[in-house]
Every structure is written in C-alpha cells, then in structure tokens.
C-alpha cells in the first residue's frame, strides 16, 4: 500500500523520521513523535494509520484532532491525494455542522479530521458513532495545548470508550503530557535534534531593497523560482491585498489568504494552493 501511496503523492522516498514512525507503530503501543515543523509529520502518522485500518469495518475507525481548520483541510487534501479505498472527511467551526453531518452520513468515512470543539459537537450529537473509534491522533499537540483546547480534547477522549491506540505529534518537547490523553505503554520518538536538522532542511537568504522597489524586487525574486510553490508572508491584510494584485497584474498564478476573508474564500484559496496555484500570501497571523 505504501508504495502506491508514495507514487500517487510523487514522493520517491520517506525520511528517517517517517520510517521510524511506521515501524514503531507496528509494535502496538501508544506513540509520541517529536519532530520539527515541516519535517513531514503528516505522512508519519497517516501512513501507519492507513495500514491499521480495516477495510471491512463499519463506522469511523480513527479521529485526528488538529488545532485549526486550515490544518484539517490540508490533512484532508493529503489523505484524498493518497487515493486509497478509505474515505476521510474534515470538520471544523465556521460552517454549518448540519452540512458536515450530511457529509459524514453520505461518505461513511473511516477517518474524521477536525478541531476539538467541532469534534465534540458531532460526538455529543452522535453524528459519529463513538463505539467504532479505536485510534486517536492529535496533530500539533503542543499547539492544541497552547490554544487552550485541553478541556475540549479531554471531552473528546472521554467520549471514546473503545479507544485502543493514541498517536501524539508535536514540534516541541512538553515537560509533561496531561493525564487526560490516557497514554499507556508509550514509545517516544524524538527527532528534535534541531540545529543540525534545521540547517540541512532550511536555507536563509536576505534580499535588501529600497521600500519603493520592494514589489519589483519580489517579482524578480519569484521569477527565479520557476514553478515551485511559494508562500509570501506579509505583515498586514492590506499588504496581502496589494501584493496579490501586483503579482496578478504580472500574470502570476497567485492566491491570497488572510483573516479578514470569508471562510469560503479562505478555503478556496487554500485548496487552489494545494492543487494548482504556486504562490499564496498569508498574513503572519491569518
């Protein structure tokens, strides 16, 4: 299965962290994976999760909790791009829960990806049969704690009576894992060997330009990158709009993304970036 998935994703080889996660998950214990942002943690849990799903099982087998709707959408898109027989849906605030309920009922997914609050809503209304859920993944667990989702996550876990496996992922090493997670016989994989790994993965360059020439300088810089997907971060929403219009006037395939946009427009921009558009411009705090 993994070979076909990697082909579908156009990935030639897994990294050491992803391979370790897959091998360790086979041991049947709960798993904590610590790895820097951007190191490929999504595949590190989706691949072993897919291997553990049962094709003939009815109902939702796994729940993936995430701190934001954008991350839920991103994971959902990756899952669908894998092109496996299993189905997934995403759920989050900002859109009617009833629409999600109809989607869950129609799709009959094996995996549901969502934010803690919306997941609680569906579980409490029995839109998701808690009796069939045996695996819980909490992606960006450190962010979930930072954003104050402790109570919501504890409530989700408390509604899953047949939970057997837990997989927590984080970009930082917490001093103590809260008891509500219910971790048991846990294996911890730590790939936060930071400086060396970050230097290998990330190159920083500084481009100096007078204020009046910044847009032109940005345009020339982007031209050197070819068709590679690119994120351009701006300080303010107005800057995002201005830069976006400028690049579009230069015939760049460009989308914008900031907190002042309607949810549907934000989702549309994100989907286009994941599948078609090469440049997206989020604010620092979208």
Task: State each model region's role.
Residues 201-235, 241-246:
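Conserved interdomain hinge at the start of the Helicase C-terminal
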Residues 130-194:
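Post-DEXD/H (motif II) to motif III coupling segment of the RecA-like Helicase ATP-binding lobe
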Residues 1-32:
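Conserved pre-motif I regulatory segment
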């Amino acid at each position: 299965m993994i070979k076909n998935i990697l082909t579908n994703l156009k990935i030639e080889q897994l990294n050491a962290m992803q391979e370790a996660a897959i091998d360790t998950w086979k041991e049947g214990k709960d798993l904590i994976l610590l790895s820097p942002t951007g190191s490929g943690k999504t595949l590190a849990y989706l691949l072993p999760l897919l291997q553990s799903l049962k094709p003939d099982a009815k109902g939702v087998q796994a729940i993936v909790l995430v701190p934001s709707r954008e991350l839920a959408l991103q994971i959902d898109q990756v899952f669908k791009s894998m092109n496996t027989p299993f189905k997934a849906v995403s759920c989050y605030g900002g859109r009617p829960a009833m629409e999600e309920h109809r989607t869950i009922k129609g799709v009959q997914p094996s995996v549901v990806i969502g934010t803690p609050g919306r997941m609680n809503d569906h579980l409490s209304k029995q839109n998701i049969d808690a009796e069939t859920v045996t695996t819980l993944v909490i992606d960006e667990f450190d962010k979930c704690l930072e954003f104050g989702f402790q109570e919501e996550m504890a409530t989700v876990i408390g509604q899953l009576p047949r939970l057997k496996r837990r997989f927590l992922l984080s970009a930082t090493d917490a001093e103590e894992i809260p008891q509500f997670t219910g971790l048991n016989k846990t294996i911890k994989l730590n790939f936060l060997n930071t400086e060396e790994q970050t230097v290998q993965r990330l190159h920083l360059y500084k481009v100096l330009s007078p204020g009046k020439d910044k847009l032109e300088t940005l345009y020339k810089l982007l031209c050197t990158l070819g068709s590679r997907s690119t994120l351009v971060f701006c300080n303010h929403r107005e800057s995002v709009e201005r830069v976006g219009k400028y690049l579009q006037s230069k015939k760049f395939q460009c989308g914008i993304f900031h907190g002042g946009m309607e949810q549907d427009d934000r989702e549309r921009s994100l989907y286009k970036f994941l599948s078609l558009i090469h440049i997206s411009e989020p604010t620092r705090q979208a």
